[in-house]
Amino acid sequence: MANILRKVIENDKGELRKLEKIAKKVESYADQMASLSDRDLQGKTLEFKERYQKGETLEQLLPEAFAVVREAAKRVLGLFPYRVQIMGGIVLHNGDVPEMRTGEGKTLTATMPVYLNAIAGEGVHVITVNEYLSTRDATEMGEVYSWLGLSVGINLAAKSPAEKREAYNCDITYSTNSEVGFDYLRDNMVVRQEDMVQRPLNFALVDEVDSVLIDEARTPLIVSGAVSSETNQLYIRADMFVKTLTSVDYVIDVPTKTIGLSDSGIDKAESYFNLSNLYDIENVALTHFIDNALRANYIMLLDIDYVVSEDGEILIVDQFTGRTMEGRRFSDGLHQAIEAKEGVRIQEESKTSASITYQNMFRMYKKLAGMTGTAKTEEEEFREVYNMRIIPIPTNRPIARIDHTDLLYPTLESKFRAVVEDVKTRHAKGQPILVGTVAVETSDLISRKLVEAGIPHEVLNAKNHFKEAQIIMNAGQRGAVTIATNMAGRGTDIKLGEGVRELGGLCVIGTERHESRRIDNQLRGRSGRQGDPGESQFYLSLEDDLMRRFGSDRIKAFLDRMKLDEEDTVIKSGMLGRQVESAQKRVEGNNYDTRKQVLQYDDVMREQREIIYANRRDVITANRDLGPEIKAMIKRTIDRAVDAHARSNRKDAIDAIVTFARTSLVPEESISAKELRGLKDDQIKEKLYQRALAIYDQQLSKLRDQEAIIEFQKVLILMIVDNKWTEHIDALDQLRNAVGLRGYAQNNPVVEYQAEGFKMFQDMIGAIEFDVTRTMMKAQIHEQERERASQRATTAAPQNIQSQQSANTDDLPKVERNEACPCGSGKKFKNCHGRKSFS
């Protein structure tokens, strides 16, 4: 262990020597930059851009560019970055994390790499943990960037898409981590390119990087919507409809367990739901409900595929074990369809439309860097997950803070009495005190005790970021007492008031140890900024959460040996510190394992998400005929349908293929079993494909022009992809919950999730292509366009149109609803001029 530690220290020292060498080169430009006029210094930005365009790298520009920012900061802000800040800036440019202590000027440090990377013109995102810090930093540091000719934008949650787009198009964009993530997800849900707000993700510099990439890594960003009661009503209506069908109205393919409406079933659906054409593009969602209702009623069998529990819950039956699968639900809306079939309550769920973890969100940037005062304890995770090194940067001045040994008490009550007594003593002499707590409840408890003791104080628990910063800024004033949860006020320095240095500086009192050593170090670091005096003292009790969960038995035994009888007895021991640190390391290890597992699961989703989003973006940005892509989908759909029956009895296989063709591909009368008999599978595939291409061309010929064709193709694909992707996300969530239980059966749940998730993804792709094929072949495009033309004409001359419709209807001969329309369109009368009569 000692050898490893020595090697790490030597590596850090070697890295610092390299950084110092580059920093000295930056400093060598100081006199040259100081001699430039404002105009000449500002002109450097354009010069750097031109040099970059001609082939110079950012690394080659770094010394001079950093020197320009230093001089600009001195002229605009009156601040001149120190050498250690230059070193921190170099680390950031390299895509790593400089560990810089509180008060060492991380915000100013960031200006140098942000400016340098903005020169490339691809956008730089400065990420903060809340909107107050985004606004503050963009306003303060934005003065330097604007002075140097770069544009600065602030991305806030309340902004409109147009305002967000403007912010993202700036050279430098300030935003919170959550808003960048949500904007990414929303960009991949829009249907028009002009509705997207983000540019490709280039360089992100994350402030308080440990908070964003470590502490929040377990919580995914989710865009979801509650499933409305109207949706549940559609499940019920679809169920009521399919219960009216007879065996001639649907066709079951036994080998593949699929089902579809026959022509008579389609007629009944159009009549039941008052539709002109069931497979029009706007009816995609309805056909999904009907398909599920068909499966629920005629494929899924009670007490074989599922059971109904005593409390009315649908439970899936494992086909291999015969046991019910608690917590599992059929995906793609089938479970709700079965609930409608059995007349039990349809469980309302919020449906996830898109999700991503911060881990995978920020790994999409070309380059990622971050700043924090406490990251070394998480170095392994930063390296393994984000490929980022942690480089400790020396302080500009030596640390003068005194960190006292922890004090341990037998009970919570005795500990809190000691805390209040310490606060009272220090407050009496005017020393400012920051009391750090792990939970809001503890803050409130200590506040009540201080009120009882007559000590005025402020309570801060991260509920109001703007008020929070103001309170923290005043926490270093003489006589100030501030109670704060450990994370409250991060990003805002506590500056000492007049006369406070002589009183010992700010005293930080920790009321218990956090699970993470890093959080404790952050609390300590609120005191002693930039070489200021300060103190830190932690109070612990055997009843603290961390002590109860880890190591308390050993400490209790130690106390028993000490024969401590008094409740208020305090003990100081080196063993105590080692025990606490050991407990924290165990918790940190457990938390890292949890985050690593979250990432392993999300990596499966990531690969699939990237495929879907890339294809989706290709469709949105395409200014071309998407016919080749749709034809390829039709071809694969036909191939799958034919291959599914390759091992069936030949007669049954031909019948099933004909049924597929009639329900999903071509008009019923245009295909028969007779013409397919005697053909090999490849010949059948080719015949069906050629028939489908003819229908495809007929469909598109009904659209008015090439622009309308492209728009129709885009809407068709996007509607179906989005519907299936949303269902797939839901299915993956359910799968993840289910495979977690398999760990008890000695199976690796992540491996099973990967395997089953991949198969589900392939199935989803097949379902997308099937729905695109069926909708493309069956959509009544002519009718849709005719109605649009009618609506346009109605706007111009409503009276003439109305009279014309009446005349046309009156002049029609007596025709049965399923006969060909006499107008010559080739459609059934009910779907053409007779449609109004049967509405």
UniProtKB/Swiss-Prot annotation:
The keyword DNA damage is annotated on this UniProt entry: no
From the UniProt entry, list the residue stretches annotated as the region Disordered: 780-839
Q: Does the keyword Heme apply?
A: no
Q: Which Gene3D superfamilies match?
A: Helical scaffold and wing domains of SecA (1.10.3060.10), P-loop containing nucleotide triphosphate hydrolases (3.40.50.300), SecA, preprotein cross-linking domain (3.90.1440.10)
Residues holding ATP: Q85, G103, E104, G105, K106, T107, D493
Originating species: Streptococcus pyogenes serotype M12 (strain MGAS2096)
Enzyme class (EC, first level): translocase
Q: List cofactor names only.
A: Zn(2+)
**Family the entry assigns:** Belongs to the SecA family.
Q: Provide the protein's localization.
A: Cell membrane; Cytoplasm
Compositionally biased spans, kind Basic and acidic residues: 780-790
Pfam families cross-referenced by the UniProt entry: P-loop_SecA, SEC-C, SecA_DEAD, SecA_PP_bind, SecA_SW
Compositional bias of kind Polar residues: 791-809
Which keywords are on file for this protein? ATP-binding, Cell membrane, Cytoplasm, Membrane, Metal-binding, Nucleotide-binding, Protein transport, Translocase, Translocation, Transport, Zinc
GO terms under biological process: intracellular protein transmembrane transport; protein import; protein targeting; protein transport by the Sec complex
Q: How does it sit in the membrane?
A: Peripheral membrane protein
Q: Which gene encodes it?
A: secA
What the record notes about the co-factor is: May bind 1 zinc ion per subunit.
Q: What is this protein called?
A: Protein translocase subunit SecA
